């Protein structure tokens, strides 16, 4: 067993895990029918001359299925938070009562749900492509190791490691499929 080939297979798994995390992050950004505090993650608010993430200047909660509440720690920032939400164009209009900001999620139409499912499928496919590209790169590195003059690996070891890489590929592609099925159900559930 070659240390170099083991290292490549470990590197392969690490990259695939990072790809899965990226797909999960993309899925979080796709809105389902329920309010989720992560829907506001990308919003930055101007605070004392710098852009600060919304979740760092107040508490963001989802007390109901279609309601987000932002409770800023500094109440003087309410108008700036409102402006940032409107500028982010997230499809919600902020309601300000002077203490907190409420965001009511509009009901998703059937067409909008289909769009979100399509978007989720696209992100899942991009994740699978990334996983397969990682497999291809690692297999190419393994083949170079087989031809290495100083420290070659045997043909049997090459086949064994390629099988390990394929097993990892299958595992993570299935995980993406499972994540997609879960996200589709979340989007289509009314």
UniProtKB/Swiss-Prot annotation:
InterPro entries: Ribosome_recyc_fac, Ribosome_recyc_fac_dom, RRF_sf. Keywords: Cytoplasm, Protein biosynthesis. Coiled coil: none annotated. It is found in: Cytoplasm. Gene3D superfamilies: 3.30.1360.40, Ribosome-recycling factor. Pfam families: RRF. The keyword Cytoplasm applies. The keyword Ligase does not apply. GO terms for molecular function: ribosomal large subunit binding. GO terms for biological process: translation; translational termination. Its main location: cytoplasm. GO terms for cellular component: cytoplasm. Belongs to the RRF family. HAMAP family: RRF. NCBIfam families: frr. Responsible for the release of ribosomes from messenger RNA at the termination of protein biosynthesis. May increase the efficiency of translation by recycling ribosomes from one round of translation to another. This is Ribosome-recycling factor. It comes from Fusobacterium nucleatum subsp. nucleatum (strain ATCC 25586 / DSM 15643 / BCRC 10681 / CIP 101130 / JCM 8532 / KCTC 2640 / LMG 13131 / VPI 4355).
């Amino acid at each position: 067993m070659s240390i170099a080939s083991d290292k490549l297979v470990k590197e392969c798994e690490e990259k695939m895990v990072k790809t899965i995390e990226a797909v999960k992050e993309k899925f979080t950004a796709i809105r389902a029918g329920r309010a989720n505090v992560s829907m506001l993650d990308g919003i930055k608010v101007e605070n004392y001359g710098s852009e600060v993430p919304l979740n760092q200047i107040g508490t963001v909660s989802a007390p109901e299925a279609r309601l987000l509440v932002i409770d800023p720690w500094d109440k003087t920032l309410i108008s700036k938070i409102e402006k940032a939400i409107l500028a982010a164009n997230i499809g919600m209009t902020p309601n300000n009562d002077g203490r907190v900001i409420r965001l009511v999620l509009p009901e998703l139409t059937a067409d909008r749900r289909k769009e979100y499912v399509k978007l989720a499928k696209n992100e899942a496919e991009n994740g699978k492509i990334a996983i397969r590209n990682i497999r291809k790169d690692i297999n190419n590195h393994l083949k170079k190791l087989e031809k290495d003059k100083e420290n070659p690996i045997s043909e049997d070891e090459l086949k064994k490691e390629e099988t390990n890489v394929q097993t990892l590929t299958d595992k993570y592609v299935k995980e993406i499929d499972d994540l997609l099925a879960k996200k589709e159900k979340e989007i289509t559930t009314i």
